[in-house]
Amino acid sequence: MITRIFILAISLCIFQATVAQPKVLYDVVLTGGRVIDPETKLDTIKNVGIINNRIAQISSEPLKGKEMINVAGLVVAPGFIDLHVHGRTNQEQEYQLHDGVTTALELEWGIEHLGKWYASRQGKALINYGASVNWPYERFKAINKYKDGVNKLYQTSIKGESTIEEMTNTILPAATEQLTAEEISKTHNNIKSALSEGGIGIGVPIGYLPKTNPKEMYAVFQLAGEMNALVFTHVRNPDIISIQEVIADAILTNAPLHIVHINSMSLGNIQLGLDMVSAAQQKGFKITTELYPYTAGSTSLQSAMFSDGWQERLGISYDGLQWVATGERLTKETFDVYRKTGGVVILHVMKPEWIKTGIAAPGVIIASDGMPYAKLAHPRTAGTFSRVLGKYVREDKVIDLMTAIEKMTLLPAKRLEDIAPMMRFKGRIQVGADADITIFNPNTIIDKATFEKGLEFSAGIEYVMVNGTFVLRKGKTVAAVYPGQPVYGKFKK
């Protein structure tokens, strides 16, 4: 309701301006497109007028613009919002852009030295960006004996050169540490400080620190509940008990919770995992989840996920692991070598029917878990949203177009509105909303990246506008344009 009031207020101001000036000249007019707004359920042919960074008019009547773009036969949708990415540079953002993404956020892990990172991206980003507080790193900082690792990461972070793989490998020695009460208190103070730098909630990837004491985990949720700070979590193990753990912690502390990639966290029990989330929602708890539309996951081979017993936990063996650097399937011998040297693997662990179940489930958000750039990186890095629209909407008819767009735009925007108020103006095609707009051909959109060929731009995304500026035109990236803006959490000072 508050969101609608904000947008209506801006709409009224724009309306009054257009009444006073009946011959309004818009900066850009999108003509004749199929306009879809998942909040109002608008799905019809309209013209869209844009002034500066806002949608100023949506009309069946002709509009006049400085630039007129004919989008007949194309869908005009809110820009896609990705809650779960790990790429930190424009190299990854360009693939996301060609997948229709206008806002890409690192919320599972978060980012260390948030203030420095936000500053390093200012005026340089293709699309909107933001991140949560990196709980593993703030925890790591609280342990005195790891000061050298803290300093190393600081130097790369302030240059904008740190990667999630470097960060995870640096903090790995602390993954098994049992924190004292004093260290837990320091961690919480670190979290509060990082939230004040703009962090969008708290990234708690407990699956990478699975030996963390449940008492320490519960304390993090208590802090989140007290502050009403959204927790994003990769659960302890890929099983139902781990999903129960975080839901229980969230319910007992009243902490808002988002469980990442439930498809790979619940594996063969995805319906039960979804039922648990739904039951919590029906009781009034702010708990949500997401998935990506692929049957394989991806992560660092040096992570705690591959500690003793990983085959039993994941239900695969060495040949279910694919080495990103070369595309080869692993053996025991190569596994042992690469586990020492470090790098990223793809885990072929899921079945197609599990993905369909998750995509069809009401309220489940689409998010990519896109990886840092490598030619053979997981294809979800480049094709998540186009794959949903091409395969699961057009080809397999698992969900309809309106529902798919809702899962990619309105649902992630609404999930973040409490923690990041600026998201109230995203995920919508409405007068007064931000002009983050993705325009695609519903008959041709499809992902092109594969496990074998590696990353490729998706097909069918024709235009992408970020904050009123075109970043993609006729399927081509616009050179030297960087309209992406930071998305900050509500605690920023």
Model-derived features: where do they sit?
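Active-site-adjacent beta->alpha loops and helix N-cap segments on the catalytic face
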Residues: 111-117, 210-220, 242-243
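Divalent metal-dependent hydrolysis catalytic cores, especially in the metallo-beta-lactamase
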Residues: 94-115, 126-137, 195-209, 226-236, ...
